[in-house]
């Protein structure tokens, strides 16, 4: 099992979670973060640090987020992020919106 970053992160990209990760398994894209499922040690220490509850344990319903993370890391060459940065400028505007991945990224 791994943890996954879900739709809530899209267009917000709060990075509070990255500094607490003991194995540096967060990767950064333009509009969101992902967790590398091959590097995550399933500790869950990042979960309470996400202000929008975007990080969840992998379940069969969330497997698509594992596959998306792999795609972005392997094919889009997203890079590791280990230091907190400011959230995206309009994060507060988008934080409660639903289905953001399909609307804004759609891979």
Swiss-Prot record:
Cited SUPFAM superfamilies: 4Fe-4S ferredoxins (SSF54862)
Cofactor note: Binds 1 [4Fe-4S] cluster. Binds 1 [3Fe-4S] cluster.
Residues engaged in binding [3Fe-4S] cluster: 9, 17, 50
Keyword Electron transport: yes
Cofactor(s) annotated in UniProt: [4Fe-4S] cluster; [3Fe-4S] cluster
Residues the record lists as binding [4Fe-4S] cluster: 21, 40, 43, 46
Residue ranges constituting the 4Fe-4S ferredoxin-type domain according to the UniProt record: 2-30, 31-60
GO molecular-function term, one example from the UniProt record: metal ion binding
Classification via InterPro entries: 4Fe4S_Fe-S-bd (IPR017896), 4Fe4S_Fe_S_CS (IPR017900), 7Fe_ferredoxin (IPR000813), Fd_C (IPR022569), FdxA (IPR054829), RnfB_subfamily (IPR050294)
Keywords, ordered alphabetically: 3Fe-4S, 4Fe-4S, Electron transport, Iron, Iron-sulfur, Metal-binding, Repeat, Transport
Gene3D superfamilies membership: 3.30.70.20
NCBIfam families xrefs: FdxA_Protbact (NF045490)
Function: Ferredoxins are iron-sulfur proteins that transfer electrons in a wide variety of metabolic reactions.
PANTHER family in UniProt: FERREDOXIN (PTHR42859:SF2), OXIDOREDUCTASE (PTHR42859)
Name the record gives this protein: Ferredoxin
Gene that this polypeptide is encoded by: fdxA
């Amino acid at each position: 099992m791994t943890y996954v970053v879900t739709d809530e992160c899209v267009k917000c990209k709060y990075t509070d979670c990255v500094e607490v990760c003991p194995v540096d398994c967060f990767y950064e894209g333009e509009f969101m973060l992902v967790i590398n499922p091959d590097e995550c040690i399933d500790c869950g220490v990042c979960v309470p640090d996400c202000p929008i509850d975007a990080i969840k344990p992998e379940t069969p319903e969330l497997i698509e987020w594992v596959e998306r993370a792999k795609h972005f890391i392997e094919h889009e060459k997203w890079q590791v992020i280990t230091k907190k940065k400011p959230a995206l400028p309009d994060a507060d505007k988008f934080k409660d919106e639903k289905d953001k991945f399909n609307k804004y990224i759609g891979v």
